[in-house]
Regions:
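Short, structured coil segments at secondary-structure junctions
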Residues: 57-59, 66-67, 168, 224-225, ...
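Active-site residues of response regulator receiver
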Residues: 9
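Active-site phosphate-binding/coordination module
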Residues: 23-123
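Mg2+-dependent phosphoryl-transfer enzymes with acidic/Ser/Thr/Gly-rich catalytic loops
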Residues: 1-5, 21-22, 185-264
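Conserved acidic, metal-coordinating active-site core of Asp-based
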Residues: 100-212, 216-224
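Hydrophobic packing residues within well-ordered alpha-helices of enzyme cores
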Residues: 25, 50-54, 158, 162, ...
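Residue-level signal for inorganic ion chemistry
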Residues: 12, 32, 67, 146, ...
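Short active-site oxyanion
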Residues: 36-40, 59-61, 145, 207-209, ...
């Protein structure tokens, strides 16, 4: 039986290293949708980064953003649902992690904008109206994602420390092994929980879902889905958890699997 829903991560999975989508992958997505499958982008990205991709693919359904904290309508460009990290929890996490791994810099992602400490160096363009302030001020409002960047620790190292000292407070992940960036969401929030909620609303069983990913933030989704596919360039933990390893993101790995399934 063909999958009823295709859930795919974007950066490092569906998209090439330069952030673009190749024609083969674009056609494969269209083929899956034409066959009746629901395609859902599941990403750590904020919603504001998705418009060009939606235009390039012609995909105007729903997207799961901010590692599951936001369900976004690509057609109306609006928030369907959001599960933010509350200020009291964010303050506690800042204190705990600041004591364990001093020297980092903080940033927050909200449904309506972005903010960061002066010491935080964004790797990507920030939106107009970005708030630059001390972390105590940044966490006064709920945030869909809290981020800690550290120049001397790897993302894996940050993840290990965070889970040890704050695992009872929030969800921790990262989406880029080459960047010392820890991503923090409210407790119980992940790509998997958002995807499960979406599937439940549509009457789709998890066993009828195929999921693609490359990084630790994809692991909950991959272990929840009926069939999990890692791209060849994936983190070792992701490869170990996958049912199948396809070609890399530079070699249209996602498209190869979709072609096999939906075109025979």
């Amino acid at each position: 039986m063909l999958p009823r829903l295709v859930a795919t991560d974007l950066d490092g999975t569906l998209l090439r290293g330069d952030g673009t989508l190749d024609d083969r992958s674009r056609r494969a997505i269209a083929t899956a949708e034409a066959a009746g499958a629901v395609v859902v982008f599941c990403t750590a990205r904020p919603a504001r980064w998705l418009k060009p991709l939606a235009e390039a693919t012609g995909h105007h359904g729903l997207a799961i953003c901010a590692n599951g904290a936001v369900l976004w309508d690509l057609h109306s460009e609006s928030v369907v649902a959001a599960t933010p990290l509350e200020p009291a929890i964010a303050r506690e996490l800042v204190a705990l992690l600041g004591a364990e791994v001093p020297g980092g810099a903080w940033a927050v992602e909200r449904t309506g904008g972005f903010g960061h400490e002066p010491e935080y160096i964004p790797r990507w363009p920030v939106p107009d109206g970005t708030t630059i302030d001390v972390v105590d001020a940044l966490v006064e409002q709920p945030a869909v994602k809290l981020m800690l960047r550290h120049n001397r620790l790897s993302a894996d190292a940050l993840l290990s420390v965070a889970r040890e000292v704050g695992g009872h407070l929030a969800e921790f992940s990262h989406s880029n092994s080459a960047d010392g960036l820890l991503e923090i969401s409210a407790a119980g929030v992940s790509k998997a929980t958002a995807l499960a909620r979406l599937c439940d609303e549509r009457g789709i069983d998890g066993q009828d879902v195929i999921a693609f990913g490359d990084m630790p933030n994809d692991l909950p989704m991959l272990t929840w889905a009926g069939y999990a596919v890692a791209v060849a360039n994936a983190h070792p933990d992701v490869i170990a958890a996958a049912d199948e390893v396809t070609a890399s993101n530079e070699e249209a790995g996602v498209a190869r699997v979709l072609e096999r399934l939906f075109t025979g």
